[in-house]
Amino acid sequence: MMKTDVVIIGAGAVGCAIARELSKYQIQVMVVDKNEDVGGDASKSNSAIIHTGYDASPGTLESQLVVAANPMYPELVKELDVPFKQIGAILPAITQEQFEQLPAIKAKAFLNRVYDIEYLTKEQIIAMEPNINPEVKGGLHIP
């Protein structure tokens, strides 16, 4: 009978990352999942953006973990020899109300130590994403 020290339930991105990290130690790790292969369900349906934590509640465990994890990705993808391009995201403001919320969103990002968010004009957003709603007022570029 095989001895298992740790059982990880779920073979998505998080479960596999935990298993990979634990494999560095002298313990037996087992990953179980309801699917036949890894990376199913939520992990295969994400937006392919590495979340920066710009909108997490400041001071929470989530914000601390996301901000701490971000610098780890370049080394991780190098070790795994997988393609990686951090292109960021556009947070468009279509309504005036959304546009007026942009400074508060940027301030929240700053509290989470996400400093390189940039304001985008309507023209910049349309140049970056020509198929966006033409009513866009402006937005933020989030790395």
Language model features with spans:
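Acidic/polar active-site rim loop that often engages polyanionic ligands
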Residues: 107, 136-137
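Dinucleotide-binding Rossmann-like beta1-alpha1 core, especially the glycine-rich loop
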Residues: 48-128
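Short, flexible turn/loop "capping" segments at secondary-structure junctions
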Residues: 43-44, 82-85, 132-135
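Glycine-rich FAD pyrophosphate-binding loop
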Residues: 23-45
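N-terminal Rossmann-like FAD-binding beta1-loop-alpha1 element of flavoenzymes
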Residues: 4-31
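Active-site substrate-recognition segment that forms the wall
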Residues: 17-24, 34, 50, 80-85
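Helical element adjacent to the flavin cofactor pocket in flavoenzyme catalytic cores
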Residues: 140-143
